[in-house]
From Swiss-Prot:
Conjugation of reduced glutathione to a wide number of exogenous and endogenous hydrophobic electrophiles. Homodimer. InterPro entries: Glutathione-S-Trfase_C-like (IPR010987), Glutathione-S-Trfase_C_sf (IPR036282), Glutathione_S-Trfase (IPR040079), Glutathione_S-Trfase_N (IPR004045), GST_C (IPR004046), Thioredoxin-like_sf (IPR036249). The keyword Transferase applies. This is Glutathione S-transferase. Its EC number is 2.5.1.18.
Length: 209
C-alpha cells in the first residue's frame, strides 16, 4: 500500500491514519512524498487526473479524495479505530467533524494559498479576498473551539478528524493567522502532538510548529 502526498498538506491526515494502522495492527505501508511539479506530470496524472493529493494505491485500487481514503482504511482496518471508536454512533460523530473540516474549513484556505486569476493583478482586491478568507476561517475555528470547551477530541478518542484540524492549525501558523483568542486550540494541538503516530508523521514530513 502506497500513499502519495505533499509534505504538510491535507495528505498528512491519511499519512497519520496509515501510521496508526502500522502501530496498532502491524500493517506496513509506503509514503511517497511528491512535489507540486510532479503532481502535474503524466505519470502522476495517470493516477489522479485532477493532479491532487492524497492518492492511495492498494494493489489495483487507486483512490483519491481524503474522505474516500479514510473510510476505506477504516473498513480495511477496523481495529485501528481511525474514527476514534468501533461503534456506529461514535464513528458517525467523528465523521461529521471530518466532513466539516474537509469540506468547509479546508476550502476557506484556498484563497490564501492560490488567489483567483481575476485578483492576481489587483492588490486591493487580493487583500480583500485574503482578509475575508481569514475571517471565515476564524469563524469556522470558533465552532471547533466551542466543541473543545467540553470535549478532548472530535471523536470518542483521537481520530482522523483531529488530525485534520491539527494540520490546518499548522497552516494557520504558516500564513500567520492568529487564533490565540480561541483558547482551546493551542492546548488541542499539544494533546494531538503527544500521539505517537502524529509524532512519527511530523518527523517524517519534517513539520515545524
Amino acid at each position: 500500500m502506497k500513499l502519495y502526498g505533499l509534505i504538510g498538506a491535507c495528505s498528512f491526515v491519511p499519512h497519520v491514519a496509515l501510521e496508526w494502522v502500522k502501530i496498532r495492527e502491524n500493517a506496513d505501508y509506503e509514503f511517497e512524498p511528491v512535489t507540486r511539479e510532479l503532481i502535474k506530470s503524466p505519470e502522476f496524472l495517470s493516477l489522479n487526473p485532477r493532479g491532487a493529493v492524497p492518492v492511495l494505491v492498494d494493489g489495483d485500487l487507486v483512490l483519491s479524495q481524503n474522505q474516500a481514503i479514510l473510510h476505506y482504511l477504516d473498513e480495511l482496518y477496523p481495529n485501528s479505530k481511525l474514527f476514534g471508536s468501533k461503534t456506529v454512533r461514535d464513528k458517525a460523530k467523528a465523521a461529521r467533524w471530518l466532513a466539516f473540516f474537509n469540506s468547509d474549513v479546508h476550502k476557506s484556505f484556498v484563497p490564501l494559498f492560490r488567489l483567483p486569476n481575476y485578483a492576481k493583478d489587483n492588490e486591493t482586491l487580493a487583500h480583500t479576498i485574503r482578509q475575508q478568507a481569514v475571517e471565515q476561517i476564524l469563524d469556522q475555528l470558533a465552532v471547533a473551539n466551542e466543541h473543545l470547551e467540553s470535549h478532548i477530541y472530535f471523536g470518542e478518542n483521537i481520530s482522523v478528524a483531529d488530525a485534520y484540524l491539527y494540520i490546518m492549525l499548522n497552516w494557520c501558523k504558516a500564513v500567520k493567522i492568529d487564533f490565540s483568542h480561541l483558547t482551546q486550540l493551542s492546548a488541542f494541538m499539544q494533546r494531538v502532538e503527544t500521539d505517537q503516530a502524529v509524532e512519527n508523521v511530523r518527523k517524517s514530513e519534517e513539520l515545524k510548529v
